[in-house]
Amino acid sequence: NKILFPLSQIKDSSKELINKIFVLSKMLSKTNYKLVIKPHPNFSIKKILRTNSNLLSSNISISNQSVDELLDKCYFSVFMATGAAYNAILKGSIAFTLESELNLADNYLDIFQDKNKYLESHDLVSLKNLLIELKNDKNKLIDYQNEFLKLRTTLINGFNQANNERLEIFGNFKHGN
């Protein structure tokens, strides 16, 4: 039961997510969930980890494997301010957005909320409760799988494909009409 946490190249978002991972690891310590941190290739987390090394616990690991390799191994993924959320959906992961206390617009999946369930942002308590619920309720887990499969299909098929109507609107806009 691995949960992937890909970090953003945005320094503040990555710091915030790392701090939330430390808290969530304690909240999930009595479960068999393993939290996997994937550093962004453009952002070193060594200094943050040195400063907070006492917060690392046995259910947290750090991996430098590619996001795609990790998504193959992690059933769930949790994001804050990174487009890797789309990679996760395309790889079949159930993706959760963690609320930021610094930035209100960090949910990369909110543009799909009108046609898909389960894309709201979570605070740590609601995420912990949901992860435990999904572990214990197979029907709820299947419902989540189906919703994310639907979103995956939307992404694969192109959620904003060109068609005659859109091309006409674009043409009118381009020509100042």
Predicted regions and their residues:
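Short, surface-exposed amphipathic charged segments that create phosphate/polyanion-binding patches used
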Residues: N1-L4, D72-A81, E133-K138
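Residues at the C-termini of beta-strands that transition into short coil/loop
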Residues: L7, P39, S66, E99, ...
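Conserved catalytic-core segment of nucleotide-activated headgroup transferases in glycan assembly
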Residues: N1-T51
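C-terminal alpha-helical cap of glycosyltransferases
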Residues: L155-N177
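Donor nucleotide-activated moiety binding/catalytic core segment of transferases
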Residues: P41-K91
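Catalytic binding pocket for nucleotide-activated donors in carbohydrate/polymer assembly enzymes
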Residues: N52-N54, G83-I156
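CheY-like receiver
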Residues: L70-K73, L130, I169
